[in-house]
Amino acid sequence: MAACLFPDAFFIDAEIFRSVSHSALSTNYPVPPQVSALLGLDAAAVCEPYFSSIDTWFPFISRKRLNQGIQANTSTETAGLALLLLCMKLVTNTPVISSTADSTLYREARSYLNTMEEVSPMSLHFFQSLVLVALFEIGHGIFPAAYLTVGRATRIGLLRGIHDRKSATQLFQKPQTWMYWEEERRTWWATSILERWAYAPCQISHYYIHTNFQIDILILARQAFLLPPLSQRKMIFYP
């Protein structure tokens, strides 16, 4: 299994890094037989239940772009599309066993997700699949997996630079279509919503330094780390 050829300069030296095209990090990885068996031959059988249910209250996947990708059947997009369709089927599926975490569909989706993280972690399909799996885990109370999956999705969004288009290093060049740009942005919004929910137990109103040092040492430490006074600190969300 070939690993993703990620541009190392993105992390090592942002000044010399140049944004790459969206196809630069694509892969020709084949769809596993077990995934094909779970999806079947009719993609519409997966899409229709999703867009008539989940998409009505959590819209972040473009139906038009998805249909275009299915019809194009591009070799570099097939693996990512299969992952996304599998995760769409997962969130619309009602497990028939008592333990949702042990369902075949969930275990296969998690396994394929881990595989695609190695071969094509920066694709939009992978990003969206993480959001769907996190949504499923939150909805079925699968913890701490839900917490960890949301963290993975958040880090992918940060790597792509969606959180700050002006100041953050942009991994990819500006997309050719407005539709892609909007879909990517909505996926980040979906991630942010899940992040606020999954991280709720870790919210604290203040960040305290527990130590026996004298106060002048604490003042110096606060200045060194650029921490504002306690009275000015807002609620912090920790990943």
Question: Where do the PLM segments sit?
Answer:
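Intrinsically disordered, low-complexity activation-like regions
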Residues: 1-54, 157, 211, 239
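Acidic, Ser/Thr-rich, low-complexity intrinsically disordered regions in fungal proteins
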Residues: 37, 45-239
